[in-house]
Amino acid sequence: MFPAADDYDINIDIEASAVDSLLDVAPSDVSSPAELTFSRNVFIPLTTACRYTCSYCTYYDVPGEATLMSPEAIRDVVETGVDAGCTEALFTFGDKPDDRYTKIHTQLDEWGYDSIIDYLHAACEIALDEGLLPHSNPGDITQAEFRRLREVNSSMGVMLETTADVDAHSGGRRKTPGQRLNTIRAAGREGVPFTTGLLVGIGETWFDRAESLLAIRELHERYGHVQEVIIQNVVPNERSDFDQPSVDTMRRAVAMARAALPEEISVQVPPNLSPTGDLIDCGVDDLGGVSPITDDYINPDYAWPALDELNSIADDAGLPLHERLPVYDRYLPEPVRRGDVTPAADPVD
């Protein structure tokens, strides 16, 4: 049973034989993809406040220093993204920031919002008004909050990271696997197209990685909502001395993901963090959201690759590169799916 699973009534039964089979998977056991995809986005860090203090994370600021973007600043970034040809507005913030940070709560109240969820809803409406599709990563939220946010989001996400209880999640407020699995389940119950994934190298074992992938698979088999799984390596930063996983470790982890997950779920690696070219033949078929105008605020020391670099990665692998929306085709109405769109007729004078 996963840590804190009983607290959230998580009933996921993973057979030891399934874990053993997955641990036997090697990169040579999986196939290369038919294509590579990516989404062009703007990264909007709604607030840098978070109730957690995970030791590998540089995203959060301590109380008194955390920022909250204004509606005007959000609109400015969104408009710039539209001009740059982006289709996705990626909204991020830490778990329940208005719970721990008095300043953030006070500012939201002054602007007329009862909670960060209310404010996220309004921010997503700004993106929609300007022509971008929101994808929100709001941390652990309730099923009712998913129900409300689905109205204004094309897709959403939260990283499972691991089903293990690792020291990297230590602190006065500890992130638990049961809590994360509950969030992924809540999204499924509300039919929210969802992104999740593993963070490799934070103290978990190979058994934990296999178990985590199988837990994601089981939740997807119940609800059909997982559109992609990210296999992300931890990177060194000012708060962490974790060693970056080796290429061989990442190749094996990606291959295990491809073998564990149904074909319709994409396996993604972040091209600014991972040795992407070395991972494609292990089953990677998506390069995630890449921004031509904003930083990766979660990993600010690692710049996004330019579109030309993505094309080079695809060319070196002998694969076509296609831009996608933040929500995958199978969750869209049939008339607007990528392969089914009829070109507009030429204008008539």
Model feature map: region roles:
Residues 1-25, 130, 210-213, 217-349:
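Auxiliary Fe-S-binding modules of radical SAM enzymes
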Residues 36-73, 96-97:
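Canonical Radical SAM [4Fe-4S] cluster-binding loop centered on the CxxxCxxC motif
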Residues 63-221:
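Conserved Radical SAM active-site core
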